[in-house]
Amino acid sequence: MAAKEIIFSEKARSRMVYGVNLLANAVKATLGPKGRNVVLDKNFGSPIITKDGVSVAKEIELADKFENMGAQMLKEVASKTNDHAGDGTTTATVLAQALIREGCKAVAAGMNPMDLKRGIDKAVIAAVTELKKISKPTSDDKAIAQVATISANSDESIGNIIAEAMKKVGKEGVITIEEGTTLENELDVVEGMQFDRGYSSPYFINNQQSQIVELDNPYILLHDKKISNVRDLLTVLDAVAKESKQLLIVAEEVEGEALATLVVNNIRGIIKVCAVKAPGFGDRRKAMLEDMAVLTGGTVISEEVGLSLEKATTSHLGKAKKVRVSKENTTIIDGMGDNDAINGRVKQIKTQIEETTSDYDREKLQERVAKLAGGVAVIKVGAATEVEMKEKKARVDDALLATRAAVEEGVIPGGGVALIRVITAISNLKGANEDQTHGIQIALRAMEAPLREIVANAGEEPSVILNKVKEGKGNFGYNAATGEFGDMVNFGILDPTKVTRSALQNAASIAGLMITTEAMIAEAPKKDEPTPPAAGGGMGGMGGMDF
């Protein structure tokens, strides 16, 4: 086992705080509408220019092990806030730095670290309660666009495209972000349920120009096994043909004689039909077939529930207004399923989302909810260069997550104003003893830090602006982008409540741990091995003798 180096109390905390300050100073430069850029060097390719706090934090690794521990713990604040709320990483870093710096000073002055921690925790609990009181629900597209714009570093084009995407697919809809091929941002919306399986044979195509299959008001047959014998299908085909209806068959596979018969009947115009493979595999395939059944008001023909294909009737089939099938995708538009059944299915899947521990499963379940409840929107990010594309895509990701957070828990006035109003509301809070009360005061002072940093990055004097904002009430604050004072909501400067709440709670959590740290242990640096003495002069093979 390698030897360890151990440092204690003040020496440990000062090394840790040095690491915290290095990381925080790099990250907080990006805060606010006039935040600065940070350039990140990469081992290959061109450097990345970013204004995204979490991207900066992730890149930082310090040479000194004890300083690095402080930096890594602060990095945890940024990534935890980003994972939970999607934004607020820089705010969380600024809050944590202020709490740690003041807290460690108080410990050095002889205060009890445990009481300081209790005081900070007490202030944060009161602050979170106050934030919830200030919070207003996001009801309209304008508020959603404003939140997205702020999160995307004041880029209105990103804010508007996210608001439009949310309007089209609903709050439950899935919005995915891809790299575009043009200079402009684009939005593609897929209505209804789409899955990534195309037609089993190109002979089903009935729209030669678009090379797709279009079915109007078709019946939809859902089966969980392979279909190779045409006799199994005869009852259903006869019933559908008698009604002069069209038919979509979704099964594990349609092959051999069955596929050939369907193609021949389709070409002759006896019945307009298309066969596609069921999406997914195993249990996920069964679940997706059930989703389709609920959406279209049909039943999955499965031996597990005592239904066989040859005994199926039109009452077992689903219905939809329109179905489009291309080479790669099938889209079911306006399924005729019962709304209560669809809502029940959505609730059931949401319960599974809450219970699952796998990120992959959660993502797939959320996709299923979207396909049932809303739709899928794809935002294609446009940019002139690859460097700009990556930076812009990261901002769109942030903005989307922040917007979802705003829809979830509402919004508060942005620009650090909400925390200033919280300070005023809980300024009379007292602890059980003097040290706890000092901990509360540390937390209240730290809540000024985000506004101070936004103002400093805009090139103004933080104390002057802070005092003027403190004199105001409600939404009154400072718009760093224009240098004006006024109502932050009217300026369109809003923050999701969830983002500010998460930033404050995560910052206090790490600060509490650091303030109460008494010893730090790291692997001792290896001493360089002494180099062996060089061989003497003389001829080789002569033992270095000189002649």
Swiss-Prot record:
E.C. no: 5.6.1.7
Cell location: Cytoplasm
- Quaternary arrangement and interactors, per the entry? Forms a cylinder of 14 subunits composed of two heptameric rings stacked back-to-back. Interacts with the co-chaperonin GroES.
Q: Does the keyword Ligase apply?
A: no
Residues annotated as binding ATP? 30-33, 51, 87-91, 415, 479-481, 495
Instruction: Name the segments for region: Disordered.
Output: 526-547
| Name the UniProt record assigns to this protein | Chaperonin GroEL
Main localization is cytoplasm
Which residue ranges have biased composition labelled Gly residues?
Answer: 535-547
Q: Which GO terms describe its cellular component?
A: cytoplasm
Please provide the Gene Ontology terms (biological process) for this protein.
Answer: protein refolding
UniProt GO MF annotations: ATP binding; ATP-dependent protein folding chaperone; isomerase activity; unfolded protein binding
Q: Which UniProt keywords apply?
A: ATP-binding, Chaperone, Cytoplasm, Isomerase, Nucleotide-binding
Please report a single Pfam family linked to this protein: Cpn60_TCP1
Q: Which reactions appear under catalytic activity for this entry?
A: ATP + H2O + a folded polypeptide = ADP + phosphate + an unfolded polypeptide
Q: What does this protein do?
A: Together with its co-chaperonin GroES, plays an essential role in assisting protein folding. The GroEL-GroES system forms a nano-cage that allows encapsulation of the non-native substrate proteins and provides a physical environment optimized to promote and accelerate protein folding.
Q: Which family does it belong to?
A: Belongs to the chaperonin (HSP60) family.
Q: Which InterPro entries match?
A: Chaperonin_Cpn60_CS, Cpn60/GroEL, Cpn60/GroEL/TCP-1, GroEL-like_apical_dom_sf, GROEL-like_equatorial_sf, TCP-1-like_intermed_sf
